[in-house]
Amino acid sequence: AAIDIDGALSNPAGLSFLPTDGFRVGVSIQSAFQTRDIDASFSTYNGFDPVNKVPTVSDVPYKKYYKGKAAAPVIPSVFAAYKKGDWTISGFFAITGGGGKASFDDGLPMFESAAMAGIFQESVAKYIKTGGQSPIVTPDMYTINSAMDGKQYIYSLQLGLSYKITDWLSAFAGGRMNYFSGNYDGYLDAKLKQNFGGADLMNLALDCDQTGWGLTPVLGVDVKYGKFNFGAKYEFKTNLNIENNTKKLDYPDSAEGLVGPYKHGVNTPNDIPSMLSVAASYRFLPMLKASVEYHFFDDKKAGMAGGKQKELERGTNEYLFGIEWDVVKRLTISGGAQITDYGLSDNFQSDVSFSCDSYSLGFGAKVMLSEKMALNVGYMWTTYHDYTKKMDNYCGTGLPGQNVYSRTNKVFGLSLDYAF
């Protein structure tokens, strides 16, 4: 329920209650550092029973920890508003979603496990065809070198108009243009160890750009009455399809099921879900204000790749709490918390896209450099709850396994606001 220049994003209707007419602008830079890790454990084939003509399975599962790192040192955003009497026009440009960029220097378990199963099955076929002359290839006989980089950004440009209907009520209507830009770039090379000949067993290579765009209608209201302020905003669902521009896609026939979504020209739904935001703030003392806020993202009604939104138990709930203290005339400090609760399920989670319930804590300060200029700084960190996904058919290998998904997130922000 903030009434400030950053309300162009969070509470645009509230900008009608800015204290003075004129033009305002805010420039913000955030730095985000994340980890996205997968602790994988899955069964592998270790031989072939020639009597019963069935593969044998290792007693000890294959275990590997896949580390994903993401760093975005500069995430810019610009907010602007012009107020004249009861009318206010506002807008912003920012990166509003997409998840950023992540690098897995040891690849992903979905590709490595499928490669291991494919190598084994191919060797069994040769073993049978040659009457046992060609050896069965098991994981101890080869090495796999793999890596995967993935990035997703949604660039947004919003413009809208607020109107102060009465002394205590205002409304907003606007639209946001969203441009999606993503890329997957990775490889997998499997080779026999030198003492087994050093021959190539399997090679995968992928370089796929993804783009798309969509429009989001936005409505908002704000009620300001004495020490109390209430703001609400509704963002309609954005229909967004992303199209592949695949520059490279090399794979064996056994990997057809894995690479299908990355083929050139494939269109995939990637809707931005509708979102309802309601917030209230109250100034208990001249120098002390507290606020509460709630967000609901209707993920189950947003189209996703393979229709996986149907696997969600429900949409996402977010609960936010904050407090501000004006220490002196030119200094305000603040603190806040956020709880994010997804409606996750095993069939929704995947190695290339997984979420974890979380809570975040943040602290900030605002310094008035002059009557017209303010400097804001803030720091936030997020603690995630690990998510364990158990599978009877691990990544299509026909064997059991599990992944434990975990994340960390730290964000530093700096912004400068100016009122002309």
Where are these regions (language model features)?
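Outer-membrane beta-barrel porins/channels
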Residues: 3, 20, 75-76, 81-420
